[in-house]
Every structure is written in C-alpha cells, then in structure tokens.
Design a protein with these regions (language model features):
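Residue cluster at the C-terminal edge of the helix-turn-helix DNA-binding motif
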Residues: 61, 297, 396-401, 409, ...
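Pre-recognition alpha-helix immediately N-terminal to the DNA-recognition helix
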Residues: 257, 361-362, 405
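Helix-turn-helix DNA-binding elements, focusing on the entry/boundary residues of the two helices
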Residues: 271, 372-373, 391, 403
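Helix-turn-helix DNA-binding segment
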Residues: 346-389, 397-398, 412-413, 418
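Intrinsically disordered or compositionally simple regulatory linkers and C-terminal tails
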Residues: 1-16, 339-354, 358-359, 415-419
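Aliphatic-rich helical/repeat scaffold segments used for oligomerization and domain docking
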Residues: 1-340
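Residues within the DNA-recognition helix of helix-turn-helix
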Residues: 290, 390-393
C-alpha cells in the first residue's frame, strides 16, 4: 500500500476488495448513529482492510480528513497519533482533541488489542475534546467504552472466499483460471483455511509455483507453507502462524491452558464438551469465564445453538509445543504435556490403539478435522452408509459417547492400524 497526501493519510489499496458488502453497510450505519466503532474478529479476518475501506467511503462525510494511526508496534498511542496528524510529538491526548475541535475528522486507531487501556483513554479524550470527530478502532476485542458500537467480522462465506483466491491467484499468475476441474479444489482449499482472508491470500500466491491440487494436499497436513513474501505488509501478516501467535501472546496463562485443551475438540463444541476436555487440568467453575474471555478475544467463535468453534489455524497453535514447527494436529499431545483422559475398558485399562482398521483410522482422523460423514464419504470416495458404519465401529471400539471424544482419543494415541 502506498501513502497519498490530501485530507488525511489513508493508504491506497493496490489490490481489489472482495466481499464484505453487508459488513460495510452495517459499519456505515453504526457510524451514522455513534461516534466510535470497533471492528473485531480473529487474526487474519480483514479488520484493517475493512476499517480502511469504510474510512475511504466516508471521506466526504468527514471533511476534516480521514486519518490512520497504526499502533501494533507501539505502547504509546498518543504520540503515534500525533505524528500521524502531523502535530508535535509531545502533544497530549487533550491537546490532540483540541486541535481537532473545529474540524470533522475520522480517526482510525488500527490494531489496539495489546494496549486497550491506553487506547480507550485516548479515545475518551478525543471524543470529549473534539465533538465532531468520529473514531474507528480495530482490535480482537472491543474497548468497552460507553456508546461504542461493535462490527464483528466473521470468516468469509465460501463464494467470497473463492473469489478472493481467484483474484489473488490471477495477480501472481495470469494463466490461473477457475475451471470445472479446479473450482472444487479451490473451494476445498478455502474451506480448509476457514475462509480467513489472510490465509487465502497467502495460499493463492503459491499457485505460481504449485498446482492447486498439490496445494490442497499440502494444506491437509501442514500450514507452514502459508508464509508471504510481500514487504508491504506488517511482519505478523506475512505468516499465518505469526498472526495467530499475536493473539496467543496476549492471553494469560489460564487462557492459554484452555486454548490448548480446547484444541483437541474438532468442529463445534458445547460448554459441557469444554468442561470434559478440561477435567483434571482446569477447575470446572473456571471453564465458562475463561472461555468467555477467549470468545471476547476472537480466539473462539460463537456458533448458533450455544455452540463454539475454534478455527483450524488456532487449533494448530494450541496443539503445538511452544517453539516447534507445525505438524498434523492428530500427531501431537497437548501443550505442556497435558492430555485428555483416554477411553477406558470396564477394568480401567486404556484400550489399545491397534483396535482400529486402516480405513477406520482414516475416518477417525478426518473426524478430528471436523468433517461430517457426507464430507468424509466424498474425501475417501466411499458410500456414506459405509462411513456411518465406520463411525459406529470407532465409537464402539473406543468406548466413546460422541464424535468430539474421537479427537481426544486420536490425538492421544500413536495409532498404528491393526492391519
């Protein structure tokens, strides 16, 4: 992105903006009704891009300028904002507000989750001293200020995700095109990446050196190849793991422990599942409040029907020992050596891993990835009723009550098939 002069300092986006029509409309409504709005969501979901797109659309409404202060690398948002506004570096928050008092500016305070208290204090002073100013904040959790509106960004729906992949792939390889052969592969790539724009953009850049089907096969096993090469983005946005680790580093010890424990649960889960996963590691009464903190910080997403879900990139970080390269989640114990209790035979002895056939082992591993029975049938090119039978056998052999427990069993075991 290049900077331009004018009424503000917004960067010019050199790539197309894909999707988010409903979110942009909601953001415009929020800023009609309120003076401060926070754009929240998980790592790589596009908070900065969406906030800057909104600000660009609002230039005419804010003749005092649309200004961005990028705060990820600072603990002093006041000085950073003063520099962005071309005011003296020694300006206080109230002095900045006073300088804006007779103007109607829109200020974007970008990436604030690491200094929420400082940014909240700055925002309060600006709103008090500059009654015509409005503020857009980006971060992985709201500031919690009176009158604050929240624009929650979810991963892209499949149609927009595929469009984004196609656009970014064609940018690096004009020969790339969606065809009847490649479209299903790209759709599966986008689904495996949970519709995260950052992950999709990083993956799309690889089509100049990899076929789409080879990229999909790599993503089935590891995410380490999702490292960007662009020097125009922040370091944490050049690597999917780095983006997620930014969130991990902001969590306290209790939140990190729950993050690791929940990583063994594939797909969606309920509070009861979370408590079961934490048995022996985290007191039962602490699970709900700590889980609420992870939801607030966009580590865990709320699903319909009082369910929760952790994106695959977050699961992989939670299952990876600190400092180790990513490996398939099912091959790794939980962080810190903690393990979920394995299913037991009536006598109390853990069932041997070798009770699964080779095909049942394949199905069990796909269950840990969150795939439904119809999806497993497509992946393995077998009938759904065959998958149903395999799942019943897995549950029976493991003494398991639900699919959620399959992940813990697979993650804990070394699993060599009995064939």
């Amino acid at each position: 992105m290049n900077m331009v002069r004018g009424p503000g300092n917004l960067p010019v986006d050199l790539s197309s903006f894909v999707g988010r029509a409903e979110e942009l409309a909601e953001g415009l409504r929020h800023l009609t009704e309120a003076r401060i709005m926070t754009v929240t969501g998980p790592a790589g979901v596009g908070k900065t891009r969406t906030a800057l797109r909104l600000a660009a659309r609002l230039r005419r409404r804010f003749p005092g300028g649309t200004w961005r202060a990028e705060l990820s690398g600072t603990a002093d948002p006041v000085t950073t904002l003063a520099e962005a506004l071309e005011l003296p570096r020694t300006s206080s928050a109230r002095e900045i507000g006073a300088a804006l008092r007779e103007r109607r500016p829109l200020v974007v305070l970008d990436t604030c989750e690491h200094i929420p208290g400082e940014v909240a204090a700055l925002a309060e002073d600006l709103l008090a001293e500059a009654p015509r100013a409005a503020i857009v904040v980006t971060g992985r959790r709201p500031l919690g200020l009176p009158g604050e509106r929240v624009l929650q960004l979810a991963p892209l729906p499949l149609t927009s995700a595929v469009r984004l992949f196609e656009d970014r792939a064609m940018a690096v390889d004009p020969r790339f095109a969606l065809t009847p052969a490649t479209a299903p592969i790209v759709a599966e790539i986008c689904g495996r990446l949970d519709g995260l724009p950052l992950a999709i953009e990083l993956a799309a850049t690889l089509v100049r050196s990899m076929l789409a089907r080879d990229l999909l096969e790599e993503l089935r096993h590891r995410f380490t190849l999702l490292t960007g090469v662009s020097r125009t983005v922040l370091p944490r946005h050049r690597d999917l793991r780095a983006a997620v680790m930014w969130s991990y580093d902001l969590c306290d010890a209790e939140q990190r422990e729950l993050w690791a424990l929940l990583s063994a649960l594939p797909g969606s889960f309920g509070l009861a599942d979370a408590r079961a996963a934490c048995r022996g590691h985290l007191p039962g009464e602490r699970v709900a409040p700590v889980l609420a903190k992870l939801v607030e910080g966009s580590v865990v997403l709320r699903e319909p029907g009082e369910r929760y879900r952790m994106l695959e990139a977050y699961r992989r970080v939670g299952l990876e020992p600190s400092g180790s390269p990513w490996r398939p989640a099912v091959q790794r114990p939980l962080r810190g050596g903690g393990r979920l209790p394995s299913p037991r035979q009536p006598g109390g002895t853990a069932r041997p891993a070798g009770t699964l056939s080779a095909r049942e082992l394949q199905v069990a591993k796909l269950i840990t990835e969150g795939l439904s029975n119809p999806e497993i049938a497509v992946r393995l090119d077998i009938a759904k009723r065959t998958v149903d039978a395999h799942v019943r056998n897995i549950l029976a052999k493991g003494g398991l009550a639900s699919r959620t427990q399959v992940a813990a069993w697979v993650a804990e075991s070394d699993y060599q098939s009995s064939t």
